Amino acid sequence: MHTHNNFKTPSDEDELDDLDEDMVVGVIAEIEQEVLNESDSDNDEYDLVDMGAPVPENDGDSSYDGNESISSDDSFDPNAADSDSDDSMLDDAGGASAGGATSAKRRKDDDNPSGSNRQSEATFDLDVDDETDETVRAMIAAIKKPRSAPPEIKLEDFITDICFHPDRDIIALATIIGDVHLYEYDNEANKLLRTIEVHSKACRDVEFTEDGRFLLTCSKDKCVMVTDMETEKLKKLYETAHDDAINTLHVLNENLFATGDDAGTVKLWDLRTKNAIFELKELEDQITQLTTNDQNKLLLATSADGYLTTFNIAARKMYVQSEPYEEELSCMGIYRGDSKLVVGTSKGRLYTYNWGQFGYHCDMYPGIKSPISLMIPITDRIACLAGEDGNIRACHIAPYRNLGVVGQHNMPIESLDVNSSGELIASSSHNNDVRFWNVKYFEDFGDIKYNEKHNAYKEQRHNLPSSKCSNASDFFADLTKEDADDDDHDPSAGPSNMA
């Protein structure tokens, strides 16, 4: 163990009190300098001059050039004075001890922590800062970059369904305890407006009317509640609307809405009346989704027993029922100018029907190898699918193409919705969280032609701009671009790079 001749160990507390802080720091600095000097003399095999390394010319300027890289050891001199020191103009003849004391004094004045090997650390930190300067700047720029979507909403209770308001920046979150939380969303922050206690059991579906005046909810308690958005009061209660738990609800216009329960019963309601307009039971299992087109002539229902059933609203009877499928029909959407109906299944398949011909599908796409439980149309030809794997995927309809991953959750996705402008998607998962995804980039997405070459494997794993994950190809593309830029600015690269 190396000891310094001037080092003294205090024998009692009085001697400790007599030691000045500057003296302690100065002594530590002297030890540091002597250890560094001995280290240099004992390790001659690492001498840069003997190794043939280039020695920087000393022009008398003690200031540090920020363009030097830490990858070269020739910039390191443990005995050199710190360039940031106010005493950098002192004569070098003062020796290592004086230099150490000066350095120690400077550390105390600058309120920096003292410690051995401080000078070398200062030089090293400076070099690291220089080398990672671009990275740090990029990180700061990413932090300061304006958000393109609202931040995540986290609840204590399980979120069963979500729905955007048609006119205002409000989203409704239904929970398993029967409450509905209304949030005002913004790219900077989300604000809880109110919590409405509507049901005694799980609220399974929540929808706004087309004009946004009323909020409709259905529940496991077999009731349908209509809440006025302005007064926040209950407008109408359909108590025991079904004999079984109600699973889904669909709003047709400002007055009409339809409901489906766990036993396969479908009912059509009018807000201006007390009772249902009609009731039909053509299925034996849970109604998974209800939908209509803009004309509101046909009401379509998918069910867990593998049927697509269509009802004629005006005639108040069943129009047609599809052939049975050996899988649950879980979701659906209308595309291509109301000419195509696409149905998602529990086996990850997508079935396409020509409008009006719902007896059997005209096309089938394998889709993804995971159950599809949710589907929302983003544009007339692009759908977003979600399910148990926690990924939201975009798919081009007719012809089918996997466009990539829109967003991710750590757990299965429970609900999915798109706002009225079609620019923002919200999704909730079994982790009791709601995440937002900006999908405005789909507006500029070109149409896909039939027989166009594509790589299905890469498409299924491709991350779109809204995704929180990046693509490996993007990283290597950036490297290639940087190399090309370097070659363009390097005259010594060859005649091919010269203008």
Swiss-Prot record:
Here the segments flagged for biased composition (Polar residues) are 113-122
**Pfam families per the record?**
WDR55
Acidic residues compositional bias, start-end: 12-23, 31-48
The Low complexity compositionally biased stretches are 91-103
For this UniProt record, the keywords arranged alphabetically read as follows:
Repeat, WD repeat
Signal peptide start and end residues: none
Look up keyword Repeat and say if it applies.
yes
Q: Which PANTHER family match?
A: WD REPEAT-CONTAINING PROTEIN 55
Annotated family? Belongs to the WD repeat WDR55 family.
Know the name of this protein?
Answer: WD repeat-containing protein 55 homolog
Q: Which organism is it from?
A: Drosophila yakuba
